[in-house]
Amino acid sequence: MVMKMLREIVESFEDLVVIDKPVKKELELTKFLLKYKDKPVLFKDVEGWEVAGNLWSSRERIAKFLNTDNKGLLELLYEAMEKPKPFSVVEKAEFLKNREKVNLLELPIPKYYPKDGGPYLTSAMVIAKKEFVNVSFHRMMVLDEERAVIRLVPRHLYSMWKDSVEHGEELEVRIVLGNPVHLLLAGATSVAYGVSELEIASAISLKAFGRPLEVINLDGIPTPVDSEFVFKAKITDEVADEGPFVDITGTYDIVRKQPIVIFEEMYHVDDPIFHALLPGGYEHYMLMGLPKEPQIYASVKKVVPKVHGVRLTEGGCMWLHAVVSITKQHEGDGKNAILAAFAGHPSLKRVVVVDEDVNIYDDREVEWAIATRFQPDRDLVIIPNARGSSLDPSGKDGLTAKWGIDATKPLDKKKEFEKASLDF
């Protein structure tokens, strides 16, 4: 299968909304992304650039692109995270055709909301190489023509940067933007230190398209060839204020001192499309939440052998609320599944466990299961003062109360809870 660049992918979407009129990158672009929140949008003129947003704002669109369905998507991601595959190193890349000095202020980097600290790169991924290759999403707030401040949560890239700083060095990185969804999903996974997200992306690509992920060696760092923009950059030991910024819950994150990135050189394909990822939008939900579903699945599967599906819900920002479908074999399986789900995704605040006859992708069916199969005095699990998500504004000092709803049928009364159905 021939590799598709972003333009071909975008123009293949049947529900694509095209905005032909000029649009400003500060706030105006956001209005269109909010208006068409679940549809892909292509802006033909954002201060001279083409910009696309809401590209992966639905589970079905992602699944279709990866040649699968909702259930298959979970299995695909789970398998890729369990069994990463080597990527392929090639000699050519379309982005090498154009090499320029960086001026971040001239790029269509949006300021999404009025209280944002500045224009934000939101869809960019950072690639760093030490003893292994790490790929991860990091928001970056533009400071001037060549500098931005990067949010580094204490995970793998932070560890690499910290090691460089302690040795009196800057961390050399490649920043990529405008990539297909298999790389975006891989970049949002949380895997063990030493596992390369490029190999997870390659496993997804092999399963979905029959070919591995292709990269080019760009001065020592593997860089995906299907990138619209590539930046050579360095993360320094200097810091600056980062934020405010609207995170996945739609609320503003706090201002912190974070490292400064210096952008040294820019590459891009001919007529590139800039990917604008709306903070707190459906696309943000999908790309951040979908890679957590296999982790919940793996955790629940350790205590309940038959797990049929996991869904982080849009109403819970695909971060705080989940639904899990199981086949109950013993009384207590529902509660064990609840506890395992919380262990699989520690940011989770609420989980509903249902039987396999309930469609977890239909909120009405899930609520029906709660209404007809759940009794609060018997089936509710509450865990007070647990470590939760820092993104939950109702929590305090990282602590939250978690609650689980066991909406499964009692094994000794299955017939009394049978759903009426008719084949036609």
From Swiss-Prot:
GO terms for molecular function: carboxy-lyase activity; metal ion binding. Pfam families: UbiD, UbiD_C, UbiD_N. The active site is at 247 (proton acceptor). Its EC number is 4.1.1.126. Pathway: Isoprenoid biosynthesis; isopentenyl diphosphate biosynthesis via mevalonate pathway. Mn(2+) binds at residues 134, 197. GO terms for cellular component: cytoplasm. GO terms for biological process: isoprenoid biosynthetic process. Its cofactor is prenylated FMN; Mn(2+). InterPro entries: UbiD, UbiD-like_C, UbiD-like_N, UbiD_Rift_dom. SUPFAM superfamilies: FMN-binding split barrel (SSF50475), UbiD C-terminal domain-like (SSF143968). The keyword Ribonucleoprotein does not apply. It is an enzyme of class 4 (lyase). Keywords: Decarboxylase, Flavoprotein, FMN, Isoprene biosynthesis, Lyase, Manganese, Metal-binding. Gene3D superfamilies: UbiD C-terminal domain-like (3.40.1670.10). It catalyses: (2E)-3-methyl-5-phosphooxypent-2-enoate + H(+) = isopentenyl phosphate + CO2. Belongs to the UbiD family. Catalyzes the conversion of trans-anhydromevalonate 5-phosphate (tAHMP) into isopentenyl phosphate. Involved in the archaeal mevalonate (MVA) pathway, which provides fundamental precursors for isoprenoid biosynthesis, such as isopentenyl diphosphate (IPP) and dimethylallyl diphosphate (DMAPP). This is Anhydromevalonate phosphate decarboxylase.
